């Protein structure tokens, strides 16, 4: 039994020994607090979880707590994105450093004298011979030196810069420098260089490998938390390289987020507006997609969503309980089952892959009050019309596949002129391209009208599609039900949901419009709005699919004896008894034969 128990431990060794958690979320949501919890020497899980847990969920929480309490807690290594920016600032010469710090236009920029003083404070660390050209060939005797520089010295230098600049100015300065690093590989150069596209995640990758070397040298598991990932391509880079990488979004209500920014970070409303415009830009195009912060898309592609209610600044029971839940499942998949809410949102997440929209994919699920699924939907064109992803501007310009297009698209001269001006030369000069030239009707029509009109979209919204599926196929009661959406309802879908009488709307990413404040918060039958907490996508299966049936695992770890009821013996027991009797008969027969030989005077 000891051998099989050791074998089970070996099965889970990879999941326990190497974990990477990348945090994402808007400033003020709690990413830094989450990282601090994971990096602590202790991880104290509340016995009763947090408010709102169902009876089954409380049972699962207790199983999670028992598991984590029964193993030694290993603190996570923390990689701060701000540290990567500090490292790039250290690569600047003195003149470049002073020029860059004193040239910023926001707030009150540092004077050249102040910038020179700051440079002097960092000078001793700049002299350490830890440059990009030798960091990829770390010898075993150099591990501690490199580790101390990147995981101890750099964070301390970041704090020095933070104290000199102040909170608001530091945030703006580092966001801009971070964009520059993503664009050019240098903190003071904003010109886009495609060869430096993955400079940021490659540096993250180096630090991950460095932490792994350090952990192996110390003979301890390697667990890493990254605070925080702000561009989705950084997450994609790491997801492709590490099976045990999880992107975790930390979310809170906008009210709590704003309160945190005002009370704890002491930001003014003007500074908060600048921050929000930076993290949630209205539209990102061209090379900026690879450069600027895009928190909305980071949240969309997250593997795990954690709701930080911020009910108490002292206990943070809900945050700690959720972290415990998912860290445990990362180490031991399938220890508990998913919640009903996770099951429903996973269906919505799967449904969104059916969307033919070339701008954004959204999925929705409608259930009754017991989470019994009644309909699913995704944003796409009405049944019978071809989704935008499958249509081609080349076909429309050349007059092919006319049934794919509307009469307006085929005959309106202004629209055809606009389409041709955008795509004719593009198609002609890229004949060898292997891409389908799909186009967005709404975008072209809005360019013609010089407006931003959402009415021109060809697709039904995911929530709207789910509502219509029910009425289309016979109709069912929805009053008191629950709406799940991988985004959140717009103003139009919010009104429909309100009219249908949903008691709860569970969403992942807040819609930037006024649907919540203006529509869903009015009247006497207001639905409850709940930020989603749970796993989705590949993480759902990776966390909840056990490596082997739990019964088999228990039997291999523990020597569980069988119970034998003498009054109702099982077939296996009877077989054992028959075999024993048969063996006894053989022995007895041999003794009888031996006695016969003795009696007859012959020796046996």
What does each model-identified segment do?
Residues 227-229, 238-265:
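Conserved phosphate-donor/acceptor-positioning beta-strand/loop module used by diverse small-molecule
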Residues 49-57, 83-85, 250-256, 311, ...:
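Short, acidic/turn-prone active-site loops that include or flank metal/cofactor-
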Residues 210, 234, 263-321:
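Small-molecule kinase domains that catalyze NTP-dependent phosphoryl transfer to phosphate-bearing small molecules
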Residues 59-122:
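P-loop NTPase motor core
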Residues 32:
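Walker A/P-loop
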Residues 97-118, 128-211, 287-291, 296, ...:
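Zinc-dependent deaminase catalytic domain
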Residues 39-41, 70-71, 236-246, 495-504, ...:
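Short, surface-exposed basic-aromatic patches at helix termini and helix-loop junctions that form
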Residues 1-27, 37-70:
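Extreme N-terminal, non-catalytic leader segments
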């Amino acid at each position: 039994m000891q051998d099989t128990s050791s074998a089970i431990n070996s099965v889970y060794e990879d999941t326990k020994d190497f974990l990477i958690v990348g945090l994402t979320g808007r400033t003020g949501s709690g990413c830094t607090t989450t990282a601090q919890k994971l990096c602590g020497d202790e991880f104290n899980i509340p016995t009763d979880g947090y408010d709102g847990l169902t009876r089954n969920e409380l049972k699962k929480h207790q199983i999670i707590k028992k598991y984590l309490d029964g193993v030694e807690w290993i603190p996570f290594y923390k990689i701060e994105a701000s540290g990567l920016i500090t490292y790039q600032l250290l690569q600047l010469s003195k003149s470049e450093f002073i020029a860059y710090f004193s040239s910023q236009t926001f707030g009150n920029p540092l004077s050249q004298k102040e910038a020179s003083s700051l440079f002097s404070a960092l000078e001793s660390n700049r002299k350490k011979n830890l440059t990009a050209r030798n960091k990829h060939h770390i010898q075993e005797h150099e591990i501690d030196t490199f580790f101390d520089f990147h995981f101890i010295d750099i964070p301390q230098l970041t704090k020095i810069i933070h104290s000199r600049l102040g909170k608001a100015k530091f945030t703006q300065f580092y966001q801009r420098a971070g964009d520059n690093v993503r664009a050019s590989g240098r903190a003071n150069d904003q010109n886009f260089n495609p060869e430096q596209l993955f400079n940021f995640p490659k540096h993250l990758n180096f630090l991950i490998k460095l932490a792994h070397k350090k952990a192996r040298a110390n003979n301890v598991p390697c667990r890493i938390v990254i605070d925080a990932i702000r561009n989705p391509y950084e997450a994609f880079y790491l997801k492709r390289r590490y099976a045990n990488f999880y992107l975790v979004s930390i979310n809170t209500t906008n009210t709590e987020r704003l309160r945190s920014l005002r009370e704890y970070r002491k930001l003014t409303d003007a500074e908060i507006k600048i921050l929000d415009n930076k993290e949630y830009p209205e539209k990102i195009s061209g090379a900026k997609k690879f450069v600027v912060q895009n928190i909305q898309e980071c949240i969309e592609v997250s593997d795990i969503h954690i709701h930080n209610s911020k009910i108490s600044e002292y206990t943070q029971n809900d945050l700690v309980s959720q972290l415990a839940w998912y860290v445990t499942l990362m180490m031991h998949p399938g220890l508990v089952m998913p919640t009903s809410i996770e099951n429903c949102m996973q269906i919505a997440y799967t449904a969104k892959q059916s969307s033919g929209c070339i701008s954004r994919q959204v999925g929705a699920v409608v259930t009754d009050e017991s989470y019994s699924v009644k309909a699913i939907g995704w944003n796409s064109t009405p049944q019978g019309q071809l989704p935008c992803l499958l249509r081609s501007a080349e076909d429309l310009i050349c007059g092919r596949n006319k049934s794919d297009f509307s009469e307006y698209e085929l005959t309106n001269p202004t629209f055809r002129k606009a389409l041709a001006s955008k795509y004719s030369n593009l198609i002609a000069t890229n004949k060898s391209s292997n891409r389908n030239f799909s186009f967005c009707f709404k975008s072209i029509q809005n360019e013609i009208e010089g407006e931003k009109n959402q009415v021109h979209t060809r697709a039904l919204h995911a929530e709207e599609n789910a509502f219509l599926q029910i009425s289309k196929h016979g109709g069912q009661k929805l009053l008191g039900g629950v709406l799940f959406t991988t985004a959140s309802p717009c103003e139009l879908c919010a009104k429909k949901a309100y009219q249908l009488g949903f008691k709860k709307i569970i969403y992942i990413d807040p819609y930037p419009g006024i649907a919540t404040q203006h529509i869903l918060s009015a009247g006497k039958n207001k639905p409850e709005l709940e930020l989603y907490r749970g796993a989705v996508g590949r993480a759902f299966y990776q966390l909840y699919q056990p490596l082997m049936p739990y019964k088999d695992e228990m039997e291999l770890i523990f020597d569980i004896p069988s119970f034998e009821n003498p009054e109702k013996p099982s077939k296996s027991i009877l077989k054992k008894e028959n075999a024993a009797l048969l063996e006894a008969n053989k022995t007895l027969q041999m003794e009888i034969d031996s006695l016969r030989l003795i009696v007859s005077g012959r020796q046996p």
